Amino acid sequence: MTGFVCRVWSSTHQERDPVRRRLFAAAMLAVVAATGLSACGDSDPNVLKVGTEGTYAPFSFQGSDGKLTGYDVEVIQAVGDKLGKRVEFVQTPWDAIFAGLESKRFDLVANQVTVNDERTAKYALSAPYTTSAGVIVTRADNNAVTGLADLNGKTCAQSATSNWSKVATDAGAKVEAVEGFVQAIQLLKNGRVDATVNDNLAVAEYTKKTGDTGVKIAARTGSVSKQAFAARKGDALITDVDNALNQLRADGTLAKISEKYFGTDVSQ
């Protein structure tokens, strides 16, 4: 387009006729306006863009058919249905997921965002749709960890920006940063770390699917956490999401999705 404008101007800028100059200027303004409208037309009000990992079973992962599935995925799809919006997922590593939200790559995060004071101050969080407990996972032959206090001086594999990373560091552990739970388990089994702290639901899903007897739940952290969807602070979208969640809770949809993945209702 730039080359076109330059060529047209070079052949016409010597024209003395004011009518032609006005016509040329009007034409160029029309081109610029059309280009601007085209650039701004990428946002579809009927689409809800959602950031999620896609590697965190059973919440957000690739199914056997290669398609994204999981508890969080199905819940936010049900929310989208209530809002009359098509959900479009943007797979993003956990440690980059809030940066993606802030830069408007997507509208919402659906990835077991644990509610805490820091996140409540920085983001608009929905009503919780999951309740879970923290657990400490060690190698099966490790009997040195029987409680949270035993993590003091130990090394834990954690996603650096996760709530579980904070739990570990608050207990005095050194954190080895990983991209997700699967990598944390690999480091644990390889003897590179002493433990990892995570959600009891994620750990139960891992042991159920893999039958891995090389690791165990050594202790509970003693805390119960709630998870929510996250939007940018001040975004009215979160009110619509809350209304949809209330409807899904009332009509039994949340409980049904929960039973499918966990065999019990974890949405309360």
Question: Where in this protein do the model-derived segments appear?
Answer:
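C-terminal motif of bacterial Sec signal peptides marking the signal peptidase cleavage site
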Residues: T35-A39
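Periplasmic-binding protein-like
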Residues: T131-T138, A204-N246, T264-Q268
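Acidic, polar ligand-binding/catalytic clefts
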Residues: Q77, R86-D150
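Extracytoplasmic small-molecule ligand-binding "clamshell" domains
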Residues: D44-Q112
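Alpha-to-beta junction loops
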Residues: G84-R86, S103-N111, K154-T155, N190-A202, ...
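Extended ligand-binding regions for polar small-molecule ligands
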Residues: G41, V73-K82, N142, S162-N163, ...
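Short helix-initiation/N-cap motifs at beta->coil->alpha
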Residues: V73, F89-L101, N143, T161-S162, ...
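Short loop->beta-strand "edge-of-pocket" segments that line small-molecule binding or catalytic clefts
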Residues: K49-T52, L148-T161
